[in-house]
Swiss-Prot record:
Source organism per UniProt: Dechloromonas aromatica (strain RCB)
Record bears the keyword ATP-binding: yes
The organism's taxonomic lineage, starting at the top: Bacteria, Pseudomonadati, Pseudomonadota, Betaproteobacteria, Rhodocyclales
Pfam families tied to this protein: GATase, GMP_synt_C, NAD_synthase
Name of the protein in question: GMP synthase [glutamine-hydrolyzing]
Keyword list, A-Z: ATP-binding, Glutamine amidotransferase, GMP biosynthesis, Ligase, Nucleotide-binding, Purine biosynthesis
Residues reported in the UniProt entry to bind ATP: 235-241
Length: 544
């Protein structure tokens, strides 16, 4: 099926993927490509519109990225965001200056933008109106440079107290640009602005739906794989489960899943995964006991990046061993999704700053004997869940909280040991049990922990991800008449719509107290429980 589509040119922003997510939520297909793709590619792509992303560079420096000139020659609408606005202004004859040179303040965080005039992009979109009747937007800013002089043909579309030109437009050519970030949830009308651009200005319809994606993905997998066999690393998490279902739908018994039990899974997860997949998917699954291998490689290693690399490499080596038992296995399938790729910032991502590597994309050796199949790498987590439901997977599987590929290896801070893993498994299970068993009440609404629409829902469903973390410290305690000196665990629960940004979950105190009491009383070796109240940013969701 041929889609109407938007081309997103990436200048290295860590939230470029969010632009794609918002566009797809508007049921418009889009793809992200590096800013320096060829003119031929852009001309042949057939985009209904082009979006220029943000980025960490400064257009005031001569060797930093620029948009291909063809972008402004195609005759299609263009939207510049943050750095995208700055490079648009500079390339079309405007003037951009650093905050220091302009004598202005940098803007990072919330800001109020005042709209100027009536443009196709912002007309009638506002969070509130000033006493003078000006439309006002609450937005998220993250910039040091600013446009100080407009290019010919442009008008000022918005401003802030610190940024005289916070948005600009050339309506005749349908060129628009905003200094703020409409793609992040902090910009309250961001979704409306992007929908206005793709639907109202670019003229795109709504032809991106998951049913169509399944048909296209199945066809693509069949063409890519042919009659060769595929081996997939199954963790029991959402991503690998949906990948398995999609690939199985495409090639059936050509797929063999390998479930690696490395001792770093959730409590009793190995048995549950085997039972679930035998009952629900009918997929061939081989269970591999690799606890000793993984623990041996991880012994003495405390650096989180090294742990991730070791775990990723060991996974691949296990798959290679198993693939030799499958005469026709030529492909290694993985449940890599967009957030994995953006946070790794490793492949096809020029100028981005690495946050951390993922085992799916950061630990693959160059001499890997298997070709790589990643059918979900262009999907966000919510799209993966939607795909799983469309494929017929049970809700309890699809809406299970995410679990990192390296497992508890990145939830045990410092050196990974079996003792720490066993303690953490039991503490984590208690936390999840209590979240499932506790439901939101009117009292929680009054405390501001949730909304009236959440009453009756379990706190497991009201949190996007929740887990325990084993800390590499001990604390003094008192149990009975005796002094204890035992380990500490941290509880982490977040609420997010995209896993790119997140807020810590305001769990009821009674729930937290109950979890803490159970862990300390039921898990010998733990005597203190703490709760993580950090958002993302500045923290990441996982501790390592």
């Amino acid at each position: 099926m041929s889609h109407q589509k938007i081309l997103i040119l990436d200048f290295g922003s860590q939230v470029t993927q969010l632009i794609a997510r918002r566009v797809r939520e508007a049921k418009v297909f889009c793809e992200i490509h590096p800013y320096d793709v060829s003119e031929e590619f852009i001309r042949n792509y057939g985009a209904k519109g082009i979006i220029l992303s943000g980025g960490p560079s400064s257009v005031t420096e001569g060797d930093t990225p620029r948009a291909p000139e063809v972008v402004f020659q195609l005759g299609v609408p263009v939207l510049g965001i943050c750095y995208g606005m700055q490079t648009m202004a500079q390339q079309l004859g405007g003037k951009v200056m650093t905050a220091e040179a302009a004598g202005k303040s940098r803007e990072f965080g919330y800001s109020e933008v005042r709209a100027h005039g009536h443009t196709a992009l912002l007309n009638d979109i506002a969070d509130f109106y000033s006493p003078e009747g000006h439309g006002m937007l609450k937005v998220w800013m993250s910039h040091g440079d600013s446009v100080m002089e407009l290019p010919a043909g442009f008008v000022k579309m918005a401003s802030t107290a610190s940024c005289p030109i916070a948005a600009m437009a050339d309506e005749s050519r349908k060129f628009y640009a905003v200094q703020f970030h409409p793609e992040v949830t902090h910009t309250q009308q961001g979704r409306a602005i992007l929908e206005r651009f793709v639907h109202g200005i670019c003229g795109c319809g709504t032809d991106w739906v998951m049913g169509d994606y399944i048909a296209e993905a199945v066809d693509a997998i069949r063409r890519q794989v042919g009659d060769e066999e595929v081996i997939l690393g199954l963790s029991g998490g959402v991503d690998s489960s949906v990948a398995a279902a999609l690939i199985h739908k495409a090639i059936g018994d050509q797929l063999t899943c390998v479930f690696v039990d490395h001792g770093l899974l959730r409590l009793n997860e190995g048995d549950m995964v085997m039972e679930m997949f035998a009952r629900n998917l009918g997929v061939k699954v081989i269970r591999v006991d690799a606890v000793d291998d993984f623990m041996g490689k991880l012994a003495g290693v405390s650096d989180p990046e090294q742990k991730r690399k070791i775990i990723g490499k060991e996974f691949v080596e296990v798959f290679q061993v198993e693939s030799k038992k499958l005469a026709a296995a030529k492909w290694l399938a993985q449940g890599t999704i967009y957030p994995d790729v953006i946070e790794s910032a490793g492949k096809g991502k020029k100028g981005a700053h690495t946050i951390k590597s993922h085992h799916n994309v950061g630990g693959l050796p160059e001499d890997m004997h298997l070709k790589l199949l990643e059918p979900l790498r262009e999907l966000f987590k919510d799209e993966v869940r939607e795909l799983g439901i469309a494929l017929g997977l049970p809700r309890e599987m699809v809406y299970r909280h995410p679990f990192p590929g390296p497992g508890l290896g990145v939830r045990i801070l410092g050196e990974v040991t079996l003792k720490a893993a066993h303690l953490l498994q039991r503490a984590d299970a208690i936390f999840i049990d209590e979240l499932r068993a506790t439901h939101a009440t009117e009292r929680d609404v009054a405390a501001g922990a949730c909304t009236e629409a959440d009453i009756g829902k379990s706190w497991y469903d009201l949190t996007s991800q929740a887990f325990a973390v084993f800390l590499p410290v001990k604390s003094v305690g008192v149990m009975g008449d005796g002094r204890t000196y035992e380990n500490v665990v941290a509880l982490r629960a977040v609420v997010t719509s995209d896993f790119m940004t997140a807020h810590w979950a305001h769990l009821p105190y009674e729930l937290l107290g109950r979890v803490s009491n159970r862990i300390i009383n039921e898990v010998r070796g733990l005597n203190r429980v703490v709760y993580d109240v950090s958002g993302k940013p500045p923290a990441t969701i996982e501790w390592e």
